[in-house]
């Protein structure tokens, strides 16, 4: 699609080799402005037994060819809730485990309505419940998983890990471009930007999941509009607080 519109598409990983030069395969691209919009991937926590257990993420759950009998979801954020409601309404038994408060970053009045709705649908939501260990006990033909939690053992057929997203920044060699990465004590690393979505290298912008903030498609679209106004129209557009 983009090639037909006249856009040169390079299918390779890009990495900065200088503040104004990006290397991608055999290409070295020098530009006055860059926009980093590399998105994110599912964050997988370090839980004993998880690496030896088949699990799903919101990227892979849509590859299922058969409906899960009992889906256990680790993570009570927006992604976990979305998948829980969808699977439950399709007829799957769903148990959701959250280590703190489910939808804890959302408005309390609104999140309460959402949680009540999911519970009315039949979703079991366990809050303030830590996951201690995961054991895979089934076969490829008959999957089974056992979750050891602070509230006891939970058994199911499938496991979905929905503990957030982490920005795709590792391969970019951002230090060569003078772009700072923020590493908060809680949460995943992301690129530091100002209100105009400029990084610490003012010639490089970052939008979407890599820039922190709400990780939603509509948020990235809004940020793209801010960057376009800054780069193409020379307008000092800023994101709203």
Kindly give the residue locations of the regions a language model identified.
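Rossmann-like dinucleotide-binding cores of NAD(P)H-dependent redox enzymes
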Residues: 62-63, 68-72, 78-141, 146, ...
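FAD-site-proximal beta/loop scaffold in flavoenzymes
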Residues: 51-67, 154, 158-235
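General small-molecule cofactor/ligand-binding pocket signal
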Residues: 8-10, 56, 124-126
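Short hydrophobic core segments
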Residues: 14, 29-39, 73-74, 94, ...
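Glycine/serine-rich phosphate-binding loop and adjoining beta1-alpha1 elements at the start
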Residues: 2, 7-8, 15-19, 23-54, ...
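Glycine/Thr-rich phosphate-binding loops of Rossmann-like dinucleotide-binding domains
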Residues: 31, 44-46, 81-83, 104-105, ...
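A conserved short coil-to-beta-strand element within the FAD-binding core of flavoproteins
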Residues: 10-21, 43, 127-142
